[in-house]
From Swiss-Prot:
The keyword Disulfide bond appears for this protein: yes
Residue numbers of D-tryptophan PTMs: W41
Subcellular location: Secreted
Tissue-specificity statement: Expressed by the venom duct.
Other known facts: Exists in two forms, due to cis-trans isomerization at 39-Cys-hydroxyPro-40. The cis conformation is the major form.
Record's keyword annotation contains Magnesium: no
Signal peptide: 1-6
InterPro entries: Contryphan_CS
Protein name as annotated: Contryphan-C
Source taxon at top rank: Eukaryota
Upper taxonomic lineage: Eukaryota, Metazoa, Spiralia, Lophotrochozoa, Mollusca
Length: 46
């Protein structure tokens, strides 16, 4: 049941954001937001 639940959750997360736009999962999505907003935190801009 747990595995089925996990398989059900993952596709939904994948469909929420295009794969090319989200290469690093949640971390990648967060970095993309920083890049779009001009990345105000210098150390994170790399």
């Amino acid at each position: 049941q747990v595995m089925v639940q996990g398989d059900g959750d993952q596709p939904a997360a994948r469909n929420a954001v295009p794969k090319d736009d989200n290469p690093g999962g949640e971390a990648g999505k967060f970095m993309n937001v920083l890049r779009r907003s001009g990345c105000p935190w210098e150390p994170w801009c790399g």
